[in-house]
C-alpha cells in the first residue's frame, strides 16, 4: 500500500555534483579525480529556427514560371509591322524588323505569338521603330506612340 502514497514526479533527475570554479577544480586535481572541462555548445552562432518562414516555404513548394507577354502586345506588334511597307510595297517581315532593332528573328516570333518573356529593352526598341505603345496600361497597348500633329 505504500506505493500509492508516493507522488510521481515526471522529469525529476538526481542532481550530480559539478566542479565549476578554479579552486575546487585544483583541489579535485590534487585528489587525483578525473576532470574534463568542456564548453557545451561552443562555436554555434546559429540561432533558433524560424519555423514561420520554413512553414511558408513548405506551403509554396512549386517555383513559378516566368510571366509571358500578353496577347495584346503580340497583336499590336504584328499589325504595326504589317502596316509598315518597304520600297516594293510589301509589308515588313519579322526578320527585317529583327535586324532593324538588333534582335533575333526568333525573339520577334515569340513576342508576336505571346511566348516571350517581357524584355523591356526589346520592347522599347520596338516601340520606337513601330511607333506603337507596347508597354503600360492594357487599354493603351497598340495606340500610336506619338499621335500626328494637326
From Swiss-Prot:
Q: Please list the residue ranges the record marks as binding DNA.
A: 94-113
Which residues lie in Basic and acidic residues bias regions? 48-70
Keywords associated with the record: Activator, DNA-binding, Transcription, Transcription regulation
Q: Which residues form the HTH cro/C1-type domain?
A: 84-137
**Molecular-function GO term, any one:** DNA binding
Q: Name one GO cellular component term.
A: nucleus
Instruction: Return the annotated region ranges for Disordered.
Output: 36-71
Q: What does this protein do?
A: Transcriptional coactivator that stimulates GCN4-dependent transcriptional activity by bridging the DNA-binding region of GCN4 and TBP (SPT15), thereby recruiting TBP to GCN4-bound promoters. Involved in induction of the ribosome quality control (RQC) pathway; a pathway that degrades nascent peptide chains during problematic translation. Required to prevent stalled ribosomes from frameshifting.
Q: Would you identify the family this protein belongs to, as annotated?
A: Belongs to the MBF1 family.
- Protein's name according to its UniProt entry: Multiprotein-bridging factor 1
> Which organism is the protein's source?
Cryptococcus neoformans var. neoformans serotype D (strain JEC21 / ATCC MYA-565)
Amino acid at each position: 500500500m505504500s506505493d500509492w502514497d508516493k507522488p510521481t514526479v515526471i522529469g525529476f533527475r538526481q542532481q550530480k555534483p559539478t566542479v565549476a570554479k578554479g579552486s575546487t577544480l585544483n583541489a579535485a586535481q590534487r585528489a587525483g579525480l578525473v576532470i574534463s572541462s568542456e564548453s557545451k555548445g561552443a562555436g554555434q552562432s546559429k540561432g533558433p529556427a524560424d519555423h514561420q518562414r520554413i512553414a511558408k516555404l513548405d506551403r509554396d513548394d512549386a517555383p513559378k514560371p516566368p510571366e509571358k507577354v500578353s496577347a495584346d502586345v503580340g497583336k499590336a506588334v504584328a499589325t504595326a509591322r504589317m502596316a509598315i511597307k518597304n520600297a516594293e510595297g510589301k509589308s515588313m517581315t519579322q526578320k527585317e524588323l529583327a535586324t532593324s532593332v538588333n534582335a533575333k528573328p526568333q525573339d520577334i516570333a515569340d513576342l508576336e505569338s505571346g511566348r516571350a518573356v517581357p524584355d523591356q529593352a526589346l520592347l522599347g526598341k520596338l516601340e520606337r521603330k513601330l511607333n506603337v505603345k507596347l508597354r503600360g496600361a492594357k487599354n493603351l497597348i497598340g495606340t500610336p506612340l506619338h499621335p500626328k500633329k494637326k
